[in-house]
């Protein structure tokens, strides 16, 4: 199936249809699906650049059907003087069957890898 935006079919509605088809497929095959989305530029105008669910670009339906939404924030991207170099925040912004929250992890950009911080770093 092809998802194409046309005069009758906007990009947002094509993404919405795609989101619902992914959900149906996951249920049918009894699998988990990871969907990666681009953020819109709304956060660029905010003082706090941490992403929010409302920042998901043209993909409100993806957020709607998702069981969990994890957003990634790296302070060093927006703040040259950041003391959090190599640290990322994984923001569990939506969790249908549990709590939401933030986990701080080590980020290795050269291989796009996340790792747990050492135990002593948890208390910072």
Predicted regions and their residues:
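C-terminal regions of RecA-like/P-loop NTPase motor modules
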Residues: 6-12, 20-30, 41-124
